[in-house]
Amino acid sequence: MLDAAVERKYSASPGETFYTGGGAQTFTNFESDDNSRILTVHRAFQHSVNLVFVRLMRDIVHYEMVQTTGPSSEWLGDTATRKMYLTRFADQESRVYMKRFYTKYHGKTPDQQITLLLLGVRKSPPKVATALRSVAPDQSNAWFNKMMYAALKNTPSASMLDDEDLANLYDKYGINRFNLNDRGYISSVHPLELWTLNYLRKHPDATLAQIETASQDVRLSTYSWLFKTRYHATQDRRIKRMVELRAFDAIGKSWQALGYPFASLTPSYAAAIGASGDRPAALAQLIGVIANGGNKVPTETLTQIDFAKDTPYETHFRRAVVAPQQQVSPEIASEVRMLLRDVVTGGTARRLAQGMTFPNGETLEVYGKTGTGDQRLNVYAKGARLIESRKVNRSATFVFALGDRFYGTLTAWVHEPYAARYDFTSALAVQLLKSMAPALQPLLDKPVQKTVTAVPAESTPAATKVAAH
């Protein structure tokens, strides 16, 4: 079954746009020659073909959606379940907005806050008036008039408005005349931005947590439109987003068990091709699990510490033996090891296809996986026209195992402004490891240390042995 799984075929075409709750994404392959091919997972793993793994990740996410939540008929067809997910979505997304607006206005003076708000308001008397009356409802007519003239300066409206017009605007767009959603519509400002600024002007020392608590009902009311039946298709997309997040959460937890170092996984298919941001130590731990037949063996720096030797206070601390934890079944570990070996024998790490030969003539089999990183900052104009592309980072990584004893990660990394000067692939990391054979020779000369279960020794006045975790 595992052999059949890695021979499953996927298109490597970059012509598809992939949609998740986070938005639309497109991907490219490192080698354009792969674009028209249909490849097995095995072959794509050998040659690092991105689009195959993007589509594989999509299948995994869809599988986890069913595993965590059930078939779509269960969470789209039940009214109570739909309401639960929509409420959860509204709460989650509104918190994102609240954090954004809190960061924007917190710590600024009242005048600075108003100036910052009006920068994003179109210079129309109704819009400016609604924004001002929403965030500062208790201010006087005189203050309102002053702010209106300042905001509309150098516009035709400024010369046309007299005191009577301003008084009418003051009354017409008062905070009690329209609900929050309507005021957001009139002013073209997000309703939660109006509410947040109004709250901060009254409670300048409020924390984000306090604002989130105080705004609980308000945040849900701003999404009242979402619960209307005429937005059924929109509701379905939001519900799918929440179910999808549960799937990514489940995937993230399974990755954490194998050493993934972060608390959550970015909900994107790009996680399958490196966007998840693994650290070198985490990659080394993962291949260590594969090298140990699926077992996670604890990392040890010190195994024993001796204090006050040959004195009455002599004490020995010995690390307690921890049994290996089975993280991956031996069958899966064996299959992955085969794939990793094929990367070296016929894929992107071919420079070590004959193994790694050391100065003493000994040759160790090598298996591993390469990865090339080309992180760019792209700036787009209207119409998705690319106007700037700047290299931010360039990296080449090889996570490897040598024989049955050694494994690790080797990464070459260049940060801007120097990244633009370099153009290399993961072959650099492979060649670098190959050239390090003389430096690694002393490791081979050390005898293999057998792990022996410690047996507590009898305590004597001159020697106390303590097991330490």
Predicted regions located by residue number:
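Polyanion-binding and phosphate-handling cores
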Residues: 22-68, 72, 348-350, 372
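Extended charged low-complexity segments that act as oligomerization/scaffolding linkers
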Residues: 1-35, 75-101
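A penicillin-recognizing enzyme superfamily signal
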Residues: 2, 42-43, 54, 103-237, ...
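N-terminal leader/propeptide and maturation segments of large enzyme subunits in energy/redox metabolism
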Residues: 51, 55-57, 67-112, 231-239
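Extracellular-facing binding/remodeling surfaces
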Residues: 257-271
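Short, charged, amphipathic alpha-helices and their helix-cap/turn boundaries
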Residues: 67-70, 78-79, 244-261
